[in-house]
Amino acid sequence: MARIINQNISIGENLRRLRIRAGLTQEQAAARVQVKGIPMSREIISQMERGAHNINVSVLIAMKEIYKASFDEFFEDLK
């Protein structure tokens, strides 16, 4: 169980790093995900970045495009 929590936190840290690299606030990132037809809020972005909210595949694909990142970057340094 602790390993899963650590992985969620690591993915969340990567989400935050990629969002900041893209020059976006949490609100801006949420708005761009919404444009792709996926319900999203700043609070959900915050929860995902803290590892407190699960990320579904459609959100991950949207963030990949928005952040101009590779899938590998989302999973870097998993513990």
Residue ranges and their predicted role:
Residues 1-22:
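A short, Lys/Arg-rich alpha-helix, primarily the initiator
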Residues 14, 44-47, 59, 73:
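Residue-level recognition of specific faces of alpha-helices
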Residues 23-47:
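Short alpha-helical DNA-recognition segment
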Residues 56-73:
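DNA major-groove recognition helix of helix-turn-helix/homeodomain DNA-binding modules
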Residues 18, 32, 48, 77:
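Residues in the recognition helix of alpha-helical DNA-binding motifs
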